[in-house]
Amino acid sequence: MKTKTKVVVVGGGVVGVSALYHLAKKGLTDVVLVERKELTSGSTWHAAGLLPLFNMSYSVGQLHKYAVDLYKKLEEETGQNVGFSVVSNIRLASTKDRMDEYHQYAGVAQTIGVDVKFLTPDQVKEIWPLCNTSDLLGAIQHPEDGYIQPADLTQAMATGARNMGAEIYRNTAVIGIKQTKDGWIVETDQGSIECEHVISCSGNFARQTGKMVGLDIPVIPVEHQYIVTEAHPDILKRKKEGLPEMGVLRDSDSRWYMREEAGGLILGPYEDGAPACYVDGPSKDSEYELFQEDLDRLAPHIEGAIHRVPAFGEVGVKKVYNGAICYTPDGNPIVGPAWGLKNFWINEGHSFGITAAGGAGWQLAEWIVDGEPTIDMLGVEPRRFGDYATKSYLKEKNEEAYNHVFKVHYPDEERGAARELRTSPCYDRMKNLGAVFGQKFGWERPNFFATDGMEQKDDWSFRRSKWFEAIKKECKNVKENVGLLDMTAFAKCRIKGPGAEEFLDYLVANKLPKKIGRIGLCHALNTKGGVHSEFTIMREAPDSFYLVSAGANQRLDH
């Protein structure tokens, strides 16, 4: 085992192996991966292997697109079959709001170059003849979507990484990580490794890895179950006749996915009441672990599946898998630099890890080698969460994020779990005046004020919500009279002392306010000249400046 290297990747699931592969592909071949047990032995091995391109986030959508494109080329590059079945994916819609959601998503897909098609119920029936389409409004299809064998994918990227010079140490547990003046020392039960960078890709062990360096990584897994059935004669007949596989089917309004598996079907619901697990982390000996199944939780979704695909109710159950999937409070992964630590990187919280692994490894390699990512990664930034994300908060929010996977994602949606966490001194007064609150960085902030008998509640919609009229009145009042703004939730800091002006002048692209008491709007740039943050800067004294920025960017900016 090496005692010195450039980068140590902690964790040998598909996410960690992808990070190693992409670092080597980027030319950084003096890199190693350490895995406490065997590759894929955490959550990768029991994943259903789906590769959904659908995502409302520009950041995550681009990670998924890159990954799907990469996986198609891996066998040619490495000689390893990854079991990628490009069978397409169909997402059904039974409601008008769901169709609105798909139309909004189509704009995201077009922007990032993902092929998506709208289907009529008759077209769905043609592709999926076992599907009951009588109550559908329509659907969307991703022709390039499908599923893959997670273990084979991981081994292919491991082979590719090794072929480029990277090394993998299995059965090597990390027992400590220490920061030095030049980098890091990763202590394992097989010896220590000195390195410049550490990447945490430890999945279910994310919080334990974080604690080694003083980080509270906001990840707690949630149980996810899926059912594998016995073979169905209609599916076997199709295979015998050489007909194509029907592909992945997602009934978003019944909140489940389904695909063919060995002549039968796989059903994976996202049910109410799925509990967080490994809240304090798995045991040190955890390996290839599953939980006791709970079919009672799945009963409504099983009924929905039988309604949509009657054949599902005509076969027996072969196996039920119930395993841990990592989650974050907003359901997006955490990919990028840690807060407060130099050259410690986080690649955790992947609830769709098989799909996102390729893209996350790609962007981390770009970030580490070249200093900046090549796409906007704000949607997966580790610093988008703060100290308010305690264990109890994470448990509640992560269960909510799991529950919302298939729910309609409205553009103005504010979720209800773990609310009233951080409130300003005038919170009660604003609430009594009709404030309808949203949450940013844990803070309750008024989105609008309900007036004239309006219900003090938001009505989420893809069209004109009631807040249009309320905000119209607010704007008119500010224009014609005066308005008050609660600044409590904004991020604030003070830069003062000798050299403060020179430091800020280097940091921002705009001119700093010259006179004491004057204010300027200034933009901080990253190393490639892109906009990192926006600050309102007030000059308090010749060598003192007061900075205000977006509340959601408190940890990112400071």
Please report, for each region that a protein language model flagged, where it lies by residue.
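Beta1/beta-strand and adjacent pyrophosphate-binding region of the FAD-binding site
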Residues: 2-15, 32
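Helix-loop-beta segment of a Rossmann-like dinucleotide-binding subdomain
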Residues: 4, 82-91, 125-164, 282-289, ...
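Flavin-dependent oxidoreductases
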Residues: 18, 177-292, 300-308, 392-414, ...
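Glycine-rich FAD pyrophosphate-binding loop
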Residues: 24-44
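Dinucleotide-binding Rossmann-like beta1-alpha1 core, especially the glycine-rich loop
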Residues: 49-127, 246, 253-258, 262-266, ...
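Helical element adjacent to the flavin cofactor pocket in flavoenzyme catalytic cores
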Residues: 141-197
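C-terminal catalytic lobe of FAD-dependent flavoproteins
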Residues: 150, 253, 262, 284-422
